[in-house]
Amino acid sequence: MLVAVLGEQRDAKFRIKNLMFLLILLMLIQPVQAQAYSEVRDDALVCMDATQKFEKKYQIKEHLLTTISSVETGRWNAKTKQKVAWPWTVNAQGKGTYFETKAQAVREVKRLQKAGVKSIDVGCMQINLAYHPDAFKSVEEAFDPEKNVEYGAKFLKNLYANRDNDWIKAAMAYHSSVPRKAQRYKKKLVSAYEMVKQAQ
């Protein structure tokens, strides 16, 4: 009888140890999964979070900064089922490229600069490093979504003040000062604005 009781106690202890091991394992795995989800979510929506924030801060027409960012760097997102701005976008020599990480985008810009390429658009708002040489302290900072979007917001607000307080004219000038290109951009902008407005 005593042997049987001791055997049951050992079995119970074994089960408790196994259960504790499983619980610890789950606790270790769960944060990694949460972090992975957070990273995917952040990369997909980080530009939009920033544009919405700075639209309010600088009193920019609602949805306009978000729309410009989407038109400039829009990438189809399967999770949100819509085109969203991608923070790790580089445009140079007439070619736009979406990189999976910030580090990859930074490396590409440095490679282009080393090769003598001057006109490079970067980040959520596609800030041109040649036209705005003092916008950022470094290439790394240029890809900081908040800093990139805030600079774009200030630039757009300045254009607004110099374009008869007309947001459409300001947005067209944001893209290009060449009338033909600006008009073509306007068509894209108006269409995208309605889509962004409905999505939000």
Q: At which residue positions do the language-model features occur?
A:
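N-terminal secretory signal peptides that target proteins for export/translocation
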Residues: M1-R15
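A generic signature of intrinsically disordered, low-complexity regions enriched in glycine/proline
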Residues: A12-R15, L22, W76, K95
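Hydrophobic alpha-helical segments, especially transmembrane helices
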Residues: I16-N18, K187
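Bacterial N-terminal signal peptides
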Residues: M20-I29
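Catalytic glycan-binding domains that act on GlcNAc-containing polysaccharides
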Residues: A36-Q200
